[in-house]
Amino acid sequence: MAEPVRLGRKRPLPVCPNPLFVRWLTEWRDEAASRGRHTRFVFQKALRSLQRYPLPLRNGKEAKILQHFGDRLCRMLDERLKEHLASGGDHAPSSPSGKKRASKGPPAQVQGSSMPVPTQPQAGSTNAGYWPAQNSGAREILLQLYREHLNSDGHSFLTKEELLQKCAQKTPRVVPESSRPWPALRGLLHRNLVLRTHRPARYALTPEGLELAQKLAEAEGLSTLNTAFQPEEHHEESPVPEAILSEPGTTEVGVQQRPLELRPSEYRVLLCVDIGETRGAGHRPEMLRELQRLRVPHTVRKLHVGDFVWVAQETRPRDPERPGELVLDHIVERKRLDDLCSSIIDGRFREQKFRLKRCGLGHRIYLVEEHGSVQNLSLPESTLLQAVTNTQVIDGFFVKRTMDIKESAGYLALLTKGLERLYQGHTLHSRPWGTPGDAESEAKPSTNPLCSLLTFSDFNAEAVKNKAQSVREVFARQLMQVRGLSGEKAAALVDRYSTPASLLAAYDACATTKEQEMLLSTVKCGRLQRNLGPALSRTLYQLYCSHSPLT
């Protein structure tokens, strides 16, 4: 006789063996996300790795065996564990079987230490163990919605404008100054703690969010909110930026940041080195060793354009973790001869120069570094010399040639000292992107452009290579793929025909094929206002009007 089929699970799903560590990593990730820091990705990777690990961990040091757990993160877990125990946390260890040990039992000891292991609460749902960090954006949103829920005269919901205005009044620093949609609100929506309805959007607490908000209110001594509710005063001097009021997931737009002023004794000049200069095979890390040997104050960052820039960094910032920084008006692109050859061949050479011209900095330096024998390169020396000469004469860059990496580092050290002397005694001011003083702006330059500078966040954000582009920008990039069509010529073409559709319409309006071929030949290009010429005009006609394969 066949055995009856058993339905359902044979055993319950295993509980999380390290819920305390999961909760703390989640808090750190959400706090980093609410402040727009890239460390949220580090915490997210570590959290995924920990959630896949089936065994309990007694301390942070044991977590080092897991992927994405470094020395610093392990130390953070150990320090948080000590704080938890010092504040009277439960000392009973978690059990792999999920059964709780009797409360009278002796506390377990951490391996190699006399410190007992705290009980880590079991996670029963997706939000189990989630506790927004103190002064974080997520915490303030939940508390503001809880206040509105308890207000008998309210609607139990807030619009986004009302919500963020209240958050800005209560804790101004939790409202980000970046141009991205507020990640704290997006995270709460993802966790199903906040519900969004209607258009324009209304935000209210879900049952899970209400339960968590009540616990947060009790922890902050706000249990009497329902009897002592007072509306927030309106402060006109601290409006919420419009970009923050956009819906989560909308396109990124510029934000008018708070003006930054650095007096002569309030900043230092710091060299920023692109992270690409510290990676890869060969002698790339040697640049950092040379800068350290020469005692050049520097930092390594991801630069979206250029290899070296200088910033005036605030020495006594309000937020030590995010000091104010203004980018000085100098940028360096470093090229070894072998890299110069490859960039000319694959087209990066022209594109990089085009992006450097649009970066907003006025003094552009092209640092060409010798490397090996010229005879071993893929292009003849005359071609390289012509490219470097064009960069200086036509593009207006300052070209500096060095023999090796040591001479390049020495040149950067001299530039750093020179900039320190140049800006000594000057008061520096921030300016928004595209305002007078910007190298890309057509407006009249400001009276003191030397001290009217971009913030580092604006500079790096505008230089992002793969950001969303308009049709005009994509059209210009497409035109630059044609041999002999430089950035200046592409700019002249898109000034007359801003989209491919407008160019095709102009071709359709021509009476004869000859007229179509010569349509673009008289377009004025560059500073000398020379004609584009019949050859390029004919090439572009063939590209956009030929129905057969190009030959």
UniProtKB/Swiss-Prot annotation:
The keyword Hydrolase applies. Residues 471-545 are annotated as: Helix-hairpin-helix (2HhH). Residues 124-243 are annotated as: Interaction with BLM. Residues 270-372 form the ERCC4 domain. It comes from the Eukaryota. Gene3D superfamilies: 3.40.50.10130, Crossover junction endonuclease EME1, DNA-binding domain, DNA polymerase beta, N-terminal domain-like, Winged helix-like DNA-binding domain superfamily/Winged helix DNA-binding domain. Its cofactor is Mg(2+). The keyword Transit peptide does not apply. Pfam families: EME1-MUS81_C (PF21292), ERCC4 (PF02732), MUS81-like_WH (PF21136). Mg(2+) 2 binds at E277, D307, E333, R334. The active site is at D274, E277, D307. Belongs to the XPF family. This is Structure-specific endonuclease subunit MUS81. It comes from Rattus norvegicus (Rat). The gene is Mus81.
